[in-house]
């Protein structure tokens, strides 16, 4: 057993993200105690982010000209898929590795990736993860005539949408993944409503986007215990629209946040928080929850990460309260959501 370590400062504590002055005690990577006491206000200690939707594979083609959604990402002929198919595996693996390092540096402790390319695609991402310490991942593969083997090597299945393949093929995939008892997720309602009902009929664990969703769709998500993941920066960039995050939350559904395609957006969750806080919500506590605990719930990791509590893993980011950027912040949580940047981070704990 490693010796107990301690860290003191202003702590964003628990599932309600209460701002507490005190000391955390950590043993073998697990938070074992919190002692509330007045300590130096030099650092803010917060839970790391959970990025609930990424496409790490397209790290190899960052910032292409913005055309339209189908031309960029729709299989099989969208720009992304053409590039993935012709790029050597070693180049893809190196590009994904750079993105994963950037994730860690910017405060993300876990992510859910929709990984194209079948078994080879999943194995490539796993190879990129080898030297990434305790960065947690849920890799949802996309079948490429290799469904049985893919279910063995992936953590589940993530599909592009119900309109992108024949119904009988789709049903075969969904049946197999449900028998495997692994998670199944799908994009829906990104640019219009035509695929929303059919996606819900498949009973996925979560749906990505629902940008075109209505209150009845959000209620159906809640009723079916289907989580929602929004990608607002990506939606705005591609012209898909703006998700009704308030409506989703009002329905009671669990809503997580993802940065979506690396070709279009960095995996920096600080940017996503600022964007959501500015455009959609003025509730800083709720915004932070979307990007941390709710992402952990979507990934079924909320018993381990997503908030700072006894018994959970100590996946923490420590921010410099005295940085040029954070000097003068009076509300620590609001400063974290609206103002903080990756360069304010002094240390990332737990994902070394």
What are these regions (language model features)?
Residues 59-94, 197-200, 227, 276-283:
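Active-site gating loops and adjacent loop-to-helix segments of metal-dependent hydrolytic enzymes
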Residues 201-202, 245-325:
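His/Asp/Glu-enriched, well-ordered alpha-helical/loop segment
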């Amino acid at each position: 057993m490693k010796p107990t370590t301690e860290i003191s400062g202003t702590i964003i504590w628990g599932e309600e993200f209460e701002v507490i002055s005190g000391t955390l005690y950590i043993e073998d990577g697990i938070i074992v105690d919190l002692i509330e006491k007045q300590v130096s206000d030099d650092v803010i200690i917060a839970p790391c982010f959970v990025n609930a939707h990424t496409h790490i594979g397209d790290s190899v083609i960052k910032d292409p000209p913005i055309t339209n959604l189908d031309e960029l990402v729709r299989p099989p002929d969208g720009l992304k898929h053409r590039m993935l198919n012709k790029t050597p595996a070693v180049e893809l693996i190196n590009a994904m590795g750079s993105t994963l390092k950037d994730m860690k540096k910017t405060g993300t402790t876990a992510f859910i990736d929709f990984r194209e390319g079948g078994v080879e695609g999943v194995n490539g991402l796993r190879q990129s993860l080898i030297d990434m310490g305790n960065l947690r991942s849920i890799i949802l593969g996309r079948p490429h005539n290799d469904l049985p083997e893919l279910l063995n090597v992936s953590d589940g299945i993530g599909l592009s949408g119900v309109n992108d393949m024949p119904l009988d093929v789709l049903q075969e995939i969904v049946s197999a993944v449900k028998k495997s008892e692994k998670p199944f997720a799908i994009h829906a309602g990104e640019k219009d409503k035509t695929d929303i009902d059919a996606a819900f009929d498949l009973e996925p664990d979560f749906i990505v986007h629902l940008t075109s969703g209505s209150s009845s769709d959000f209620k159906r998500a809640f009723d079916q215990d289907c989580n929602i993941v929004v990608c607002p920066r990506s939606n705005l960039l591609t012209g898909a629209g703006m998700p009704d995050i308030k409506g989703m939350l009002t329905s009671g559904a669990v809503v997580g946040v993802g940065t979506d395609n690396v070709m279009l957006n960095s995996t920096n969750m600080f940017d996503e928080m600022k964007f959501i806080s500015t455009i959609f919500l003025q509730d800083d506590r709720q915004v932070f929850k979307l990007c941390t605990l709710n992402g952990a719930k979507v990934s079924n990791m909320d018993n381990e990460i997503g908030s700072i509590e006894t018994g959970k893993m100590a996946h923490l980011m420590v921010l410099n309260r005295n940085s040029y950027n954070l000097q003068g912040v009076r509300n620590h949580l609001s400063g974290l959501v609206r103002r903080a940047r990756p360069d304010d981070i002094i240390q990332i704990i737990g994902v070394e």
